[in-house]
């Protein structure tokens, strides 16, 4: 690392510029959402919360928000359940084809979204599934399973299999072992996976655009609004809210992921007496 | 056995695909004894223990605990409990809930359960630690919690898989004695798995020595040390100088032998040895040899030797010596009496040995190859 820095003295500057280029536009979004003017340009004219207030009255927006929550919630549950099985198998068992299968599961992370989206559309139409929310849910599940698997794998990595054996040895049933040992220890990882997969689905545009049909999700709705210059400030306000919400969810997810990794699950067993 | 049998393994075998991890295991354990399974890593000790615990079903053979055939009974319904090598302390529970974990289904009232937990914690000298978090415990304390958690179940047999291997040396030695004392005071049968011969010898009433999935010998530590039945057992427990010998006459309790380097001696017959033959093998423990500057008096055999190397251990000194007619370098262990190392490398000295110190190891199986290699 040190040698690399000596070889490329401009590396630090480059990194700073790169980050600025990447994130400054994102920071401009909330900035202009408070501006009284309807065009995005400096200098900013006055301060207002009107654009935010107007959001509450837009019916189609609220519908698309509901669609997004339905899609995000279903996706999160589906991909986390799938991820749970996969991660446990990858960490605990050495089986034939494990590495290849892991690679395939991670593939959606690197395939261009537009390709996934168009091929899914073709596939779903072929299977008789018309563009709809269930179609988006399936597409998003495919897309978010890699996130669930990698989060849950790190939770299982820290999990000594002897813990489950010890519980079983102490007379617990298989289900009891899962409830009293596996769940409390893996729990934070599960929460983290649910939050991350929800966020990814909530923010996803391309798949949703192809597969949602006449029930747009929030990003698809925003895209449709960008065509109307008069609606731009509202869109900026909505975008800013979305940004804040996503960051909040991801931070919470990271908190739980770390808790899972350090084994700081629930503190106390419920002391149920019979 | 006259004493009451608690565990009886007969013809127990465990195969993983083509690998046979445990082979034709016959073993009877007595109520209240401290038994150790000793052997090098990978010899099948853990597999044997896990079959007793119920985590693995034998491929063939039967396991009885207290007279009942438990071969197909799963771990959660066997009267055994296990202390895991990693201790497996539940990280999300405090010490009290860890120890009380298994009492959940016992039907005991909360008050009774709490009493049992604190009693078990007292037993392992962790009285009052109920509300400690698992991650606030040292390695030694985790070990005690794991013990208490198993003992609170009042098992008929306590199983321990390398229970001390994760502790550092001083703590390990202290725990050896403490575990032994604990076992004697509660009288539960302990079955411990270890690859550490000293651990097995200091703690156990009896030891079963395993190699390659096969139980080679079951005996008290003293018997294993004094009369090992095979060369591998002799080699694994304590140091041993192996010497080829010729058996001239096997009459009664003694064998007349011509021992390489040491000449004719009458060696006591080892009852644990399977078969004898003209080509014989004997062993002499390093501390049973006397080394002196002049020919020592009163020994059954004395020979001259050259000191090839010296190792200073503090409490003892090891001389590695060469004796004419003995194929391998011999080791002589001498207590460090007066803080002096009496011989230097290259010096000549005398060895003395009593016939009673020579261990009969039966037929010499690699005698043929050794003859072939001779120049
Ligand atoms: N679940 C398993 N599947 C396949 N092979 C195993 C399994 N458990 C143990 N073995 C093999 O059985 C042999 C004995 O293992 P083990 O009982 O753990 O030995 P030890 O405890 O004496 O070190 C080893 O070769 C090990 O690789
Ligand atoms: Mg082992």
Describe each region flagged by the PLM.
Chain B
Residues 56-64:
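Conserved post-Walker A/P-loop segment of ABC ATPase nucleotide-binding domains
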Residues 240, 250-375:
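Non-catalytic connector elements of ABC transporters
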